[in-house]
């Protein structure tokens, strides 16, 4: 997709300073990451699916995925589009009998749905250029990425943007 790069969910971590979970998206084929601060329920929803946890009852995102399927639609892709006023934005792109439907979404909800439906996730190249973190060598630990990004945030000022 022009203007977008394919990303995968690299992991979910916890930012000790802000006491918030972070989902880390990794650009496919590169050592570039996009950290997105998310809520605790969405972090749990993403982690449970990534860890193949079996639950006795469906969670909200499981219910939404089942409803989309029962309506003969499918999640085609998730687009993480921008960061505006400290808020990330995403678009959930559905296919309903050949009709494209685009829904405004929080990235955390869209990602939680994507991991349940195996839908590809894409991030805007512009967003990645402005907010991504690139490592020269392969990173093994999610915590290293969070630490590196926290250090970047501590050193940056609004004038840098």
Per-region residue spans from a language model:
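Divalent-cation
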Residues: 1-161
């Amino acid at each position: 997709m022009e203007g977008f790069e394919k990303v995968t969910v690299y992991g979910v971590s916890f930012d000790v300073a802000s006491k918030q979970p972070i989902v880390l998206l990794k650009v496919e084929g590169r050592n570039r990451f996009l950290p997105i601060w998310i809520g605790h329920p969405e972090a749990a929803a993403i982690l449970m699916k990534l860890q193949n946890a079996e639950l006795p009852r469906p969670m909200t995102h499981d219910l939404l995925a089942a409803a989309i399927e029962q309506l003969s639609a499918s999640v085609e892709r998730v687009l993480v589009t921008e960061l505006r006023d400290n808020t990330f934005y995403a678009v959930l792109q559905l296919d309903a009998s050949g009709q494209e439907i685009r829904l405004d979404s929080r990235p955390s909800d869209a990602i939680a749905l994507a991991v349940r439906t195996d839908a590809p996730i894409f991030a805007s190249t512009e967003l990645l250029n402005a907010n991504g973190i690139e490592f020269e060598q392969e990173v093994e630990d999610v915590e290293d990425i969070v630490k590196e990004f926290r250090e970047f945030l501590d050193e940056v000022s609004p004038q840098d943007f």
